[in-house]
Amino acid sequence: LKNILDAVLNTENLITNTNTLSKKSNNTFSLIGHSMGGYIALAFAEKYPQYLNSFGLFHSSAFADKEEKKEVRRKAIEFINTKGAHTFLKLTTPTLFAKAFTEKYPEKVSALMENGKNFTNATLIQYYEAMINRPDRTAVLQNFNKPVLFIIGEHDQAIPLQSSLQQCYLPLQSHVHILSQSAHMGMWEEKDKANNILLDFLDNKL
């Protein structure tokens, strides 16, 4: 998990490396990112749209944080500095899931919380600072003339349903799917449905 997060935080290097790979191939590809991975997909689409035949936001948003959201993240950073990353993740991880899922599969949520031991305070703080500082990229959605996938969790507290729907009107071609039993972790909460959505989208774009 830490290695994945380090890659996410180093967005510019990741975009550059993906661009290098793209230049070695004559084919375009689809790029789909979950949560902060969606910010990377947007950044890549902004810089290298010619290499994409489509892209997708899975529980992610092109909007920059509003000031009140930034303040919540700053308070999270204070908590991490005081109590530690693992304590913070034990408190916040359950909120990523719909209540029905946490009640039915507490062991899965616990396993994810256990993985949180791999995060250092510094790494998690970097993650939050990156989210605070990310720019608004709604113009990317407006200017991209190929298909854009949106997978939205009806019970998502991190990116509320109404906020997610607002961005769906921006692209020329939007493919919108709402997971009615999911919050922010639809690939776990409604795994089969999420996989089918992804496969159907990719089958039509590759």
Annotate each predicted stretch with a short phrase:
Residues N26-K66:
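Conserved hydrolase catalytic core segment
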